[in-house]
Amino acid sequence: MRPPSRCPGMRHNDGVSDIVRVLLLGSTGSIGTQALEVIAANPDKFEVVGLAARGGNPALLAEQMAATGTRNVAVADPAAGAALDIKLAGPHAVTELVRRTEADVVLNALVGSLGLEPTLATLTAGTRLALANKESLVAGGSLVTRAAAPGQIVPVDSEHSALAQCLRGGRADEVDRLVLTASGGPFRGWTAQMLESVNPEAAKAHPTWSMGLMNTLNSASLVNKGLELIETHLLFGIPYDRIDVTVHPQSIVHSMVTFVDGSTLAQASPPDMKLPIALALGWPDRVPGAAAACDFSTASTWTFEPVDTEVFPAVELARQAGQAGGSVTAVYNAANEVAVQAFLDGRIRFPEIVRTVARAVEAADRWRAEPETVEDVLAADRWARGRAAELVGA
């Protein structure tokens, strides 16, 4: 286990400053738009050398192309490609863009399993990967970690960015436990019975973070924290039984590392994704003014409490999926995506999201073998989606 390393292949301009060439995947999403703001605010540090998106918001993508001046663009949706006269379009277009673009860092902010192949292409090319697409790591598992050189993946999630920063404070053999923090979501303190009446609008309201729809819904069910638990194990190599999750409603402390001597290092900052985005783009260097700092001149309280695992079983279910090994984590992720859509469509109640995931994971014994190819992962993904669709009555 080691913190991410310095960006390979960074070029030098005028022998004075380093300009990091950024290929941004998922540019029209929440992380992508914030990343472009970070880049625009730091033209002496970063430049955009390519954009990619699924294609659901072609108008915004057109604006981004104009603002960045790049025509090196790919979209997964052929219709969006035709509308914007983008030649590189289709299901493998984003991966092809990664292969043909010279970049110092690829920021993968795609949503869902669409990000897996671009993640592997980035790692194969030896380019630093700023990873916000947690699903590609969770689904790909050992397939992704085997493809990565030590320190090649830099996390963008605030929790894993916090862990990477805290791990600078000690050696690998000094680490005792990793502690992920969770806001608890909009339904913290609710009973299981109360959750039965939750509607999609209530689940879309996160108390502290501004995120995309899928991440917001996953945060409400704590599936997001389950995915982050799996990601933590894969990124840092710490066994699942040495990774804890605690509820911290203020979302100021983003994660902690406890060392063998009893000391704990925590990374704290007001909730703003621009900080971990900027750090991932410039790693290991910090970007001055990336986000506001904590204000200790006014009274404030930071609280911590255990996760109510009976009401919110998603975290422990993720731990079980991870300990099962193989592609069971891919099953966890894919079944959740199907169940979330069923909830949004009004076909199941909110607690049935995690119940559906649990039933899919329980039936996933055939997927315990370690994946050897992308097709192995996609096969588990397809099976899980089919199984979840049956369970939700699709």
From Swiss-Prot:
Gene3D superfamilies: 1.10.1740.10, NAD(P)-binding Rossmann-like Domain (3.40.50.720)
Pathway note: Isoprenoid biosynthesis; isopentenyl diphosphate biosynthesis via DXP pathway; isopentenyl diphosphate from 1-deoxy-D-xylulose 5-phosphate: step 1/6
Catalysed reaction, written as an equation: 2-C-methyl-D-erythritol 4-phosphate + NADP(+) = 1-deoxy-D-xylulose 5-phosphate + NADPH + H(+)
Keyword Manganese: yes
Entry binding sites for NADPH: T28, G29, S30, I31, N57, N133, E135, G212
Binding residues for 1-deoxy-D-xylulose 5-phosphate: K134, S158, E159, S183, H206, S219, N224, K225, E228
UniProt: Mn(2+) binding residues: D157, E159, E228
Cofactor(s) this protein cannot do without: Mg(2+); Mn(2+)
Record-level GO BP terms: isopentenyl diphosphate biosynthetic process, methylerythritol 4-phosphate pathway involved in terpenoid biosynthetic process
EC number: 1.1.1.267
Keywords, alphabetical: Isoprene biosynthesis, Manganese, Metal-binding, NADP, Oxidoreductase
An annotated Gene Ontology molecular function: NADPH binding
General function of this protein: Catalyzes the NADPH-dependent rearrangement and reduction of 1-deoxy-D-xylulose-5-phosphate (DXP) to 2-C-methyl-D-erythritol 4-phosphate (MEP).
Family: Belongs to the DXR family.
Name of the protein described by the UniProt record: 1-deoxy-D-xylulose 5-phosphate reductoisomerase
Gene from which this protein is expressed: dxr
